[in-house]
Amino acid sequence: MALDIIQAGPLSLLQDLGRYGYQDVGVTPGGAMDTHAFHWANQLLNNPANAAQIEITMGPFKACFKQSTSFALCGADVVATLNGNKITSWSSSQAKAGDVLEMGYPKQGLRSYLAVSGGFTSPKTFGSISTVIRNKLGGLSKKGSKLANGDILPFIAQVQPHLRKVPQQFIPEYKDIINIGVLTTYQFHQFSEEAKKTFFNELYTVTPEIDRMGYRLKGKPIEYAEQSFVSEGIALGAIQIPANGQPIILMRDRQTIGGYPKMGCVCNRDLNILAQATPGTQIRFFEQDLYEAEAELHQEQHYFFKGNGDGND
């Protein structure tokens, strides 16, 4: 009752929704970069909302099912096959013992999520399976290691009686230009009006310097007069403005404190879109209404968590 990894690709990680309550001692939450895709993959299989999955960055990826099960694939637009027969993303499928799943490079997007019925099982570290390489925590080894060829991931074999697919209106398009909503917090009101105008009116480009810790952007520099700050806690999606004026958006594996001035935070909805952005993608920022963002988040949490547990217990 396991999945045998034949080709892990450059970065495949066991992830759940992350570990919380330890940022005060320098432990980042980690967790799935694109929670929209993650949630839907579990939802398709009637899994607990926090059931562990494999986050596959880029690909290629190849694995063999050692036991019959239902599985789901959500996220990047990628060609995937089961025993050479094409399968559809954002839907559930069934595999028999010995079936081989193969995935190529994404046509659009960056990260795919592979879920199995019941979730992958592995010992927790600080309450989570999530892999954080920089903290050497979680994953199959409990030491923050990415998945490797030959790894065997256990799961409880379950076959769902019905195949399901995500309604089309909930499947995102990964575009070359994306609009990112910003909650204007932190030092936003200390920036000059000219700096704010630059931030919201200019296009910024995703550079090749992106990882699970943060996304570095390039565009017209944003000026900030103050040079020294006391380090403070870093929220998910915080937009730092370092000395060169080029924004850095901090992601799931971010450091827990930092001293750069910050324009605010990317709203949860658009962090998922950003997590799928590849180098060269252009970003246009806009000011996101706080109450609207809260309502969207509460609606999402109500749908995915209601009666569905927190998983991996």
Where are these regions (language model features)?
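Conserved "landmark" site that anchors the functional core of diverse proteins
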Residues: 1-313
